Amino acid sequence: MKISSGAINFSTIPNQVKKLITSIREHTKNGLTSKITSVKNTHTSLNEKFKTGKDSPIEFALPQKIKDFFQPKDKNTLNKTLITVKNIKDTNNAGKKNISAEDVSKMNAAFMRKHIANQTCDYNYRMTGAAPLPGGVSVSANNRPTVSEGRTPPVSPSLSLQATSSPSSPADWAKKLTDAVLRQKAGETLTAADRDFSNADFRNITFSKIFPPSFMERDGDIIKGFNFSNSKFTYSDISHLHFDECRFTYSTLSDVVCSNTKFSNSDMNEVVLQYSITTQQQPSFIDTTLKNTLIRHKANLSGVILNEPDNSSPPSVSGGGNFIRLGDIWLQMPLLWTENAVDGFLNHEHNNGKSILMTIDSLPDKYSQEKVQAMENLVKSLRGGRLTEACIRPVESSLVSVLAHPPYTQSALISEWLGPVQERFFAHQCQTYNDVPLPAPDTYYQQRILPVLLDSFDRNSAAMTTHSGLFNQVILHCMTGVDCTDGTRQKAAALYEQYLAHPAVSPHIHNGLFGNYDGSPDWTTRAADNFLLLSSQDSDTAMMLSTDTLLTMLNPTPDTAWDNFYLLRAGENVSTAQISPVELFRHDFPVFLAAFNQQAVQRRFGELIDIILSTEEHGELNQQFLAATNQKHSTVKLIDDASVSRLATIFDPLLPEGKLSPAHYQHILSAYHLTDATPQKQAETLFCLSTAFARYSSSAIFGTEHDSPPALRGYAEALMQKAWELSPAIFPSSEQFTDWSDRFHGLHGAFTCTSVVADSMQRHARKYFPSVLSSILPLAWA
């Protein structure tokens, strides 16, 4: 038998195949013709069984990509192998008598199986870098295990191309990626080919629907070491995923939702990263490069690695664009500085902390030069936009919160442009917050706004006294803010020393009351009376109070005391007993007025006065009773005979036999929405109303030290009696109830001072049902 069409490297053919070929040569006079009639480009394993027979050609599966990516010398060997098998000639018809067609088919199949398996082993090593597995098992082109004899893999360059055909749709790509990451999660070591998803198409894929929840959890599973170069993620959702050591070069992430997505140790160069506006939490970049990548103006770049920019042109985006450099990154800018553009790009206080200002500033301090250069380009753009003061006004706070801090203060260009902006910002703060409380200072405000205000007061020292309401608030928050730096506190303390030395302030601090009692503030305790507010109307009037008192009066609770301060006139302490808090705040210290009124409207004691003293029948008394609730002490007394008689005429019908009439009791329940309330809730309300009327009858309001209006005393006792009937459990004890009752009427030798009774009842209510008391008792009496 002749074997034609070139020599074969028989060193690669098993011994048994050699013997079979020798047998053919010796015993066959007539050869058989066998053809390879088809080479399929399928995913079938290279070691599938061959279909053989005398009249049937040998048919085997060979992926086209394997043929394409063989090295030239291997392609030649492959072609020779195919040609050799094809040209085994039927040269001796006598051979048909000696060897059956079945044996010949088996010999041919064994020859081809062995040679192709060896070539596949070469391919696996070159394509994936994988050495042959133990026991003659290797990984075929479609990543399925195949059995072959172990060979030493040849040394050849490693390629990152896949041997299988590419998926045809985003869904197929997603399925393939899911399979790969799950294998990685299971602990399998993936080859470079397994992790190669270059040129993939993931458009419109929501990854939370294809990955297990563990990939979206905090500190959950990680997608590690994958190659997504030149891939499309447009309109996909990769939120909460963590990509580590991944490559996204030249990929498109336009309108991708990447809320809280983490990119770490990754290559994101030359990427279009204009993620969707629906992204709620910014993605993070940790030790990641973004060279020539187009970034939205609301990104956080705190972990990015910057490099020197090259001479690349700005990226091309649909609709055109304007860009500035931030190191080697491209930041998108508006084409025109319209009102919407100013708000969207600059107002992070209105956009959940996101703006181009915060994006630039988010870089680490080691990139100060790049940050300043980018901010200078931004300022040049704003200056070129010829924006009016009215247009800049809504973003003044955002601008100064960033640009008034280092390293930008080192730039003459930025400082020159920012100066007028900061002055207008400060003037607006003085106008707005001298008479109302500052917003509760969060971390942002403490670290970015308070230092700017300190600097502004330092430049405009006269404002410390003309706007002492704002100035004292700023110092208060600087000294108490947990996120304020030591530098901020030190500067605040130094400024306050200047304030205390001012001629309008110094007369009020040398009275043995201020601070550490020698005229200096004591910042070691919040109980020290360190703060001194000047009256907005009278320079001789001032209010001295502690840190804790000032904080609670600016942000009150129902239990806030509104008289825990010193009122000073010409430096001397004066009594506030007969001063209405609301009038004091309205006239002299308006910074407290809004908070006081807000608490006052929640007190509903006046509703009972309107029931008893209707404005139509008793207009004058109604006003007297309501006015008395606005101050701790009243100069109006109702103990003369005419007043006593008039009050008796009004209250006696409500108290037949000294108890509340059923009709009047129902009126009270209706006024306070207690008709369906529990007996205990009704009793607590009546108890607090009794406390208030006890105060009316005391020497503080309508009584004196020796006398009090009997009708008011009797009405207070009747309210308390009804509360006892409804729920004795709300009282300290039956003995205490009896003692209070005796004191109202002077029975059994009890001391009849209703002021003592009112104070005692008030303390009990504040301890056991404070919310009910706070909803009824007038603020001035609290």
From Swiss-Prot:
Any one GO molecular-function label of the UniProt entry: ubiquitin-protein transferase activity
Ranges of biased composition (kind: Low complexity): 157-171
Biological process annotations from GO: protein ubiquitination
Location of the active site: 753
Keywords of the record: Secreted, Transferase, Ubl conjugation, Ubl conjugation pathway, Virulence
GO cellular component, one term: host cell
Protein EC: 2.3.2.26
PTM section of the record: Ubiquitinated in the presence of host E1 ubiquitin-activating enzyme, E2 ubiquitin-conjugating enzyme and ubiquitin.
Region of interest: Disordered: 137-171
Family, as annotated: Belongs to the SopA E3 ligase family.
The name this protein goes by in its record: E3 ubiquitin-protein ligase SopA
Source organism (scientific name): Salmonella newport (strain SL254)
Taxonomic path: Bacteria, Pseudomonadati, Pseudomonadota, Gammaproteobacteria, Enterobacterales
The gene coding this protein: sopA
